[in-house]
Amino acid sequence: MPFIENQTTTAEPIVPVDVKGKDAFHKLVDDLSAVLGPSSGLDSDDVDPKDIQKLMEGYVSNHEEWQRYALADESRAYTRNLVDEGNGKSNLLILVWNPGKSSPIHDHANAHCVMKILHGSLKEHRYDWPEQDKINNGEACPLTVTKETILRENEVAYMSDKLGLHKISNPDPNDFAISLHLYTPPNAAHFGCSLFDEKTGKSHHIKQCTFFSNRGLKL
């Protein structure tokens, strides 16, 4: 399903197009950018995530439309592949999850995250924030799981720092999972995010969440 690094193709796949010449996936990309506005400034309070969720829910996944962006690397847990930057207001990514692998527990750098499953399924573990007083005093504050959810193909989920922390994993030991993520504003790419230890609650900041590819080209 995904393009493994060093894999080559001999021809572009044939995909259905609408009357304007764009397939449904690329029309979704344009529509998401339009919702975020052409030029005005943006912070996370200016966006209604329900509008983004509605657009993503309306798209039925077709791998021929997005496969060119789904670059995989078997040496890492998952890859983050940039599809679009939404007039500078967001990052739209396709993440390719290797079988049985997961993300660290992380925050979202004060941004909205809307996620759609394009292929396979993903499991979300959601956590409460650790008690900062305990962390500041050098005490362990194990993270508490508040919710576990299995997300299947074409399902959409929303996450933000107001809802806590989370970890995403691919529960299938044999197959890739592939998901579409929209982050707005694109804070993690610009400023980094924080990763958390489940047993202690302690965090460390990573300066930048890097991309594996940009619009189908490996970086």
Curated annotation (Swiss-Prot):
Disulfide bonds: none annotated. The gene is CDO1. Its cofactor is Fe cation. Induction: Induced by L-cysteine. This is Cysteine dioxygenase. It catalyses: L-cysteine + O2 = 3-sulfino-L-alanine + H(+). The lineage of its organism: Eukaryota, Fungi, Dikarya, Ascomycota, Pezizomycotina. Keywords: Dioxygenase, Iron, Metal-binding, Oxidoreductase, Thioether bond, Virulence. Belongs to the cysteine dioxygenase family.
